[in-house]
A protein has these predicted regions:
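Conserved, structured core segments of small domains
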Residues: 1-116
C-alpha cells in the first residue's frame, strides 16, 4: 500500500545539522529496504505561489501567504504493508525531530494513495 507522509509545522527555520544527518540515515535505510520511493524538503513559502479559483475566477498569489499557520516542510512516499506500518514509520521519523530539534512542534500526516 502506498502512503504519502506530509510534514507540517509552524516552525519556519531549517532543521539542525544533527537532524538532517539522522533523517539522511533513516532515508538511506528505508530506500535500501525498498520502502521509501521518494522524498523531499520544500523551499520557504516566499518562493512559492498559489493558483486559486474564487467565484469562478482564476488568480495567482505569490508567497509568502499571510493566512498560512502551518507550512508543509517536506514529504515522503512509501510502499508499506498498511496503516499500522505507516504509523510506526512516521512515529520513528517524528522521534528524530523530538531528539535532535528540541522545542520543534509539528505533524506528520499519513495519507494512503487511492488505487494501486
Amino acid at each position: 500500500m502506498r502512503f504519502m507522509f506530509i510534514v507540517k509545522s509552524a516552525h519556519q527555520g531549517s532543521p539542525t545539522p544533527e537532524l538532517l544527518e539522522a533523517m539522511h540515515k533513516l532515508a538511506n535505510r528505508e530506500i535500501k529496504a525498498g520502502r521509501m520511493l521518494d522524498s523531499g524538503g520544500l523551499m520557504p513559502l516566499a518562493t512559492g505561489a498559489q493558483v486559486r479559483i474564487t467565484d469562478g475566477q482564476l488568480s495567482v498569489v505569490d508567497g509568502p501567504f499571510v493566512e498560512a499557520k502551518e507550512v508543509i516542510g517536506g514529504y515522503a512516499i512509501f510502499e508499506l504493508q498498511g496503516k499500522e506500518e505507516a504509523v510506526a514509520s512516521a512515529t520513528e521519523f517524528m522521534q528524530l525531530h523530538k531528539d535532535f530539534m528540541p522545542g520543534w512542534e509539528g505533524t506528520c500526516e499519513l495519507r494512503a494513495f487511492a488505487g494501486p
